[in-house]
A protein has these predicted regions:
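Short Pro/Gly-enriched beta-strand edge/turn motifs at strand-loop
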Residues: 169-176
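Catalytic cores and adjacent binding grooves of peptidoglycan-active enzymes
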Residues: 23-27, 134-135, 145-149, 160, ...
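Sec-dependent bacterial lipoprotein signal peptides
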Residues: 1-18
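Generic short beta-strand segments
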Residues: 162-168
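Active-site acidic/histidine clusters and adjacent loop/turn architecture
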Residues: 69-159
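Post-signal-peptide N-terminal segment of Sec-exported extracytoplasmic proteins
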Residues: 39-74, 79
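Bacterial Sec signal peptide processing site at the extreme N-terminus
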Residues: 20-38
Length: 256
């Protein structure tokens, strides 16, 4: 059978389409393929706890309710870290660890600079519990710094201390006892003095006694500490504390 010219052209077109059909990708996914995840339609999850800047416990003046507010604000690690972040206090959490049956770190971290103040801890970058870091930050901002300006007429540039974390027992006038110290949990700071911008150095060892401005300053911040820390011990307590204030951020209520 002879094909006319029009029929031959139609047949060629059909064959070309049939051959090219193999080059068109299949629109169906291969067997077993998983679809790409879709973008979330709601808001992304944020921090588990949020404290607005300037509204936390660290930015509130010390009063009769400070200790209770601190205990509430540091009831969980997340809440405590949020309080520090809101106040621009540098705190880097560290892993929990156990060094002995009575010594170790839980909910602790490294307290770095407080970006809202001038005073720096000396030595710096101190490992302590988050609760202690929050209490120290309240005391520094709301007591130590303003009291120095009011009584001594100069800014505090350094807060000196004798350490925080130490695996040992409680010390008294007779030496170390069998009772485990809060230092064994990094929950207590031994504060020894301050350095001022004008160059003066005020120490518990050298300036506690008397009624001069230096002694009044130290007693003022000790009295304020009693409303911030669960335990505050000074040279008035015993000879073992003749050169420092023992500041403990745990349950209890002892001020001497």
């Amino acid at each position: 059978m002879r094909l006319s010219g029009g029929m031959r052209l139609a047949l060629v077109a059909v064959l070309m389409v049939a051959g090219c059909g193999r080059l068109i990708p299949d629109t169906l996914p291969p067997p077993g393929a998983r679809p790409y995840p879709t973008a979330p339609t709601g808001p992304l999850p944020g921090p588990s706890v949020y404290v607005a800047p300037g509204t936390g416990v660290i930015d509130r003046p010390i009063d009769g309710g400070t200790l209770g507010r601190l205990r509430q604000a540091t009831g969980s690690a997340a809440q405590c870290e949020a309080e520090l972040a809101a106040a621009r206090v540098t705190f880097s959490p560290t892993p929990d660890r156990v060094n002995s049956p009575t010594c170790g770190l839980t909910a602790a971290g490294v307290l770095g600079p407080d970006l809202g103040t001038v005073a720096r801890m000396t030595p710096g970058d101190v490992t302590m519990t988050c609760a202690l870091a929050a209490a120290v930050s309240v005391w520094r901002r709301q007591s130590v710094e303003p009291a120095a300006l009011e009584i001594l007429g100069s800014e505090v540039v350094a807060m000196e201390h004798m350490g925080v974390y130490a695996c040992r027992g409680v010390r008294n006038d007779s030496g170390e006892t069998a009772r485990v110290s809060a230092h064994a949990r990094a929950a207590a700071l031994d504060f020894s003095g301050v350095r001022l911008r004008d160059g003066r150095r005020i120490t518990v060892r050298g300036d506690w006694r008397g009624d001069d401005p230096e002694a009044r300053f130290l007693r003022r911040i000790r009295d304020d500490a009693c409303r911030v820390f669960g335990t505050t011990l000074s040279p008035d307590y015993n000879a073992a504390h003749h050169d420092h204030l023992h500041l403990e951020a745990e349950s209890g209520r002892l001020c001497r």
